[in-house]
Curated annotation (Swiss-Prot):
This is Inner membrane-spanning protein YciB. It comes from the Bacteria. The keyword Cell membrane applies. InterPro entries: YciB. The gene is yciB. It is found in: Cell inner membrane. The keyword Transmembrane helix applies.
Length: 179
């Protein structure tokens, strides 16, 4: 259910884009993200920081897109979010000396420190590359290509990278934890 809720605003954005235009889609994205956030709070009495940050960025960049009738703002939102994620991962590793990935998964999974560090850096690089790809596609390709990339391309890339991360984690888990 949680994963469905996370993807619902993206589905709403895509549907409204196909039915109307980027501005209706952006308005629908803001509303859908707010509804999911409120529902999550009511249902679980907790909202993850990432969901809150995403909502704020959707509201700000989406609001600017609709207000100025300029789709460049919503296109930048994707890169800004990925940049923040990459920055948080790198900050956690180099300044806080404990990879954010380890903070998120370390209670459930036991891995050597160097594996946590590699995984953390890999995700940071992934987010940086996705952000750069978004800039290229958003500003040098037609709008419909960008929407498809945002909805399907980035989602597929994230799922593939998550699966590859899972394989990498499994490969480095202690034998007794694999059962």
């Amino acid at each position: 259910m949680k994963q469905f809720l996370d993807f619902l605003p993206l589905v709403v954005f895509f549907a409204f884009y196909k039915l109307y235009d980027i501005y209706a889609a952006t308005t629908a994205l803001i509303v859908a993200t707010a509804i999911v956030l409120i529902y999550t709070w009511i249902r679980y009495r907790k909202v993850e920081k990432m969901a809150l940050i995403t909502f704020v960025l959707v509201a700000v960049f989406g609001g600017l897109t609709v207000f100025f009738h300029n789709d460049e703002f919503i296109k930048w939102k994707v890169t800004v979010i990925y940049g923040l994620f990459a920055g948080a991962l790198l900050f956690s590793q180099w300044v806080m000396n404990k990879p954010l990935i380890q903070r998120m998964l370390g209670k459930e999974i036991t891995l050597p420190q160097e594996v946590w560090s590699r995984l953390n850096i890999a995700w940071a690089v992934f987010f940086i590359l996705c952000g750069l790809a978004n800039i290229y596609i958003a500003f040098w390709m037609p709008q419909n290509i960008w929407v498809n990339f945002k909805v399907f391309g980035l989602t597929a890339l994230t799922l593939i990278f998550t699966l590859l991360s899972g394989v990498y984690i499994y490969k480095h888990m202690p034998q007794d934890d694999k059962h």
